[in-house]
Amino acid sequence: MKNITKYQGVIPAFYACYDAEGNISAEGVKALTRHLIAKGVKGVYVGGSSGECIYQHVDERKAVLEAVMSEAKGKLTVIAHVGCNNTADSVELARHAESVGVDAIASIPPIYFHLPEYAIAKYWNDMSAAAPNTEFVIYNIPQLAGTGLTMSLLREMLKNPNVVAVKNSSMPTQDIQMFKDAGIAARGEGNFVVFNGPDEQFVSGRVIGADGGIGGTYAVMPELYLAMNEHINKGEIEAARAIQYDADRIIYKMCEAHGNLYAVQKEILCRMYGLELGGVREPMPGLIPEDEPIVAEAQAMIEAAIAKL
């Protein structure tokens, strides 16, 4: 029986951290890790979309994970996204992730080419085989990856005993229920996890059965998601929904900027906590002077929402 309690709760997707020259900042990574530990989150999801994984080299992704683990080991659940645009690099990252002691590895499906399900299953299983003592999380994000997780593919992957979870970032919450049912059928009640992915519907996802959430805006306002999660655990749905509405309005505001959402969030973390995390890597657009009032208003909205808790 797997210990899935370590995956139940609020798990921020970890932001890419750069220095002034645009190189990986190990100090920034460590500072953000310490910050999230202090905030009381359950874990971190390293090297995913928020970590700008597809814009980083294999060695950079290893360096980020090593810096996270130097601070987080024994304190946070660490899930390392190891998917790359080819199997060899993905396998290398999977092997490295196991060597540094992560709790689980994860991967999106292969991107760009629309491959048959048996090829996707092999891609994932090859990574899992490279980290045989580490649990595996399927990352379903069809709107970006171009390929969605089907029930037949999930059932095939559940033949691998290391597959313990789906991180579901598709928009229909029904997918959470369907993936949960398939996991229970294969593993039994309490032995399979589904994470809610879309931050804007954390409450909806949790209510329909998600065990926790992994999200790209959690790190900039973890207090809100932790409070939502606590209210849901207590059955206080109206209170959770009110906080969800606040979080959603903040997300909408941040998305008004010319600069990418991650650039906005890292700037807010710098202003609120002095965390120097850098910008975003091109071709993602960085902040421009006209974004200043948007950043300032979003920060004020976060501070006001936290003050209401």
Residue ranges and their predicted role:
Residues 2-148:
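Active-site beta->alpha loop and helix N-cap motifs at the rims of alpha/beta catalytic domains
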Residues 2-6, 186-192, 269:
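Catalytic cores of TIM-barrel enzymes
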Residues 6-15, 39, 210, 217, ...:
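C-terminal alpha-helical cap/extension of soluble enzyme domains
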Residues 29, 61, 65, 90, ...:
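A general structural signal for well-ordered alpha-helical segments in protein cores
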Residues 39, 63, 67-72, 96, ...:
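Alpha-helical structural signal in soluble globular domains
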Residues 56-59, 117-120, 150, 178-179, ...:
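Short secondary-structure transition/capping segments
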Residues 75-76, 134-135, 161-164, 276:
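Secondary-structure boundary/capping positions in well-ordered alpha/beta enzyme cores
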Residues 130, 142-248, 258:
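Catalytic alpha/beta core domains of metabolic enzymes, predominantly
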